[in-house]
């Protein structure tokens, strides 16, 4: 059993980072592992904390700068980033083999992806442009949004989008118009750097960029209801392997399986959550 440790973030360091005026404008596309030592993952949180147990480890393309990940119909769908390397892929789970791929032209920098109303949606980082595909990867439309694009998921009927701040926005899945927006908080404090998103059992799972943590968010209140500590996963790789940060959450609803990976990670992990700390 591999279970991650408790939060080790210092409250004093946390306050410094939370108050930085440039904290929301850090360049997501130039992330480097360990570049941010503090995070919105709060040591003072009174919410439950979950570690993990690795169920399976699957091959993953080590050249993929993973920005979005979903599971559907027995396959993984992955969005990758970097200028000139951004793509949307269909991937075989057991082998990691890329079965289908469509590349994004420059200057687009690929970001989060989701499947909603039988359409694949892919965001871009700073181009304020999203792409719509059918299941055969034919582009069938585009849409615009006024912010940066980071993560996106679907609650079954609406899109939910992050832009690296503490704000989540709900979009009409047909018109792509913003329906509502909501700040994400823990103990009244904003949780910034919301990145890759996944809708899991009525909660929004949000990877906190630059950290090993995933926030479990209530879509009703915007409050964090729990934290997932995935520290230790990246240590599964030899130090000579040039990996980047944790990024990529996919949920298999039919079989209740949770998958996670990271940018340039050579493995994708199926994990089971293990409660570490209960609500005080």
Question: Could you say what each language-model-derived stretch is?
Answer:
Residues 41-63, 93-99:
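A short helix->beta-strand "capping" segment at the edge of beta-propeller domains
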Residues 55-87, 102-114, 150-151, 262-267:
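Beta-strand-rich domains and repeat architectures in extracellular enzymes and scaffolds
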Residues 57-62, 101-106, 141-147, 182-189, ...:
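Surface loop/turn motifs at the tips and blade-to-blade linkers of beta-strand repeat domains
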Residues 66, 194-196, 241-251:
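Signature of short aromatic-glycine-proline-rich micro-motifs recurring in repeat-based ectodomains
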Residues 73-74, 117-119, 156-157, 201-202, ...:
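Short coil/turn segments that connect the beta-strands within blades of beta-propeller domains
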Residues 77-83, 120-127, 161-165, 206-210, ...:
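Conserved beta-strand positions in repeat-built beta-propeller and related beta-rich domains
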Residues 92-96, 134-138, 173-176, 218-222, ...:
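Short loop/turn segments that connect beta-strands within beta-propeller blades
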Residues 95-133, 137-149:
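Blade-loop segments of beta-propeller domains
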């Amino acid at each position: 059993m591999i279970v991650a440790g408790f939060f080790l973030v210092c409250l004093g360091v946390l306050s410094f980072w939370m108050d930085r005026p440039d904290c929301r404008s850090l360049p997501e596309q130039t992330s480097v592992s360990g570049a941010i030592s503090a995070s919105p993952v709060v040591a003072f949180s009174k919410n439950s904390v979950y570690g993990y147990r690795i169920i399976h480890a699957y091959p993953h393309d080590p050249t993929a700068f993973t920005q979005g990940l979903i599971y559907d119909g027995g396959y993984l769908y992955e969005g990758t980033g970097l200028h000139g390397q951004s793509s949307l892929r269909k991937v075989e789970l057991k082998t990691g083999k890329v079965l289908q791929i469509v590349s994004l032209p420059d200057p687009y920098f690929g970001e989060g992806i989701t499947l909603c109303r039988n359409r694949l949606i892919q965001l871009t980082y700073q181009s304020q442009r999203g792409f719509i595909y059918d299941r055969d990867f034919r582009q069938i439309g585009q849409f615009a949004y006024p912010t940066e694009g980071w993560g996106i998921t679907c609650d079954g009927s609406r899109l939910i989008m992050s832009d690296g701040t503490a704000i989540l926005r709900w979009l009409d899945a047909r018109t792509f118009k913003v329906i509502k927006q909501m700040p994400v908080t823990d103990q009244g404090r904003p949780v910034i750097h919301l990145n890759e998103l996944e809708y899991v059992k009525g909660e929004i799972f949000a990877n906190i960029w630059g950290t090993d943590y995933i926030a479990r968010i209530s879509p009703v209140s915007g409050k964090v209801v729990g934290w997932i500590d995935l520290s230790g996963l990246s240590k599964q790789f030899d130090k000579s392997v040039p990996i980047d940060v944790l990024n990529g959450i996919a949920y298999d609803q039919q079989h209740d399986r949770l998958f996670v990976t990271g940018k340039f990670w050579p493995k994708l992990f199926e994990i089971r959550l293990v409660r570490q700390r209960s609500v005080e």
